UniProtKB/Swiss-Prot annotation:
Purpose: Antibacterial peptide, that adopts an alpha helical conformation which can disrupt bacterial membranes. Each caerin displays a different antimicrobial specificity.
Compartments (UniProt record): Secreted
Biological process (GO), any one: defense response to bacterium
Name under which the protein is recorded: Caerin-2.4
């Protein structure tokens, strides 16, 4: 559903932010 898609998108964004913090480019 829509909520599930939004949750997945937010989860992906959070994962990217955490990755960037742990391993600065």
């Amino acid at each position: 559903g829509l909520v599930s898609s939004i949750g997945k998108a937010l989860g992906g964004l959070l994962a990217d932010v955490v990755k960037t913090k742990e391993q600065p480019a």
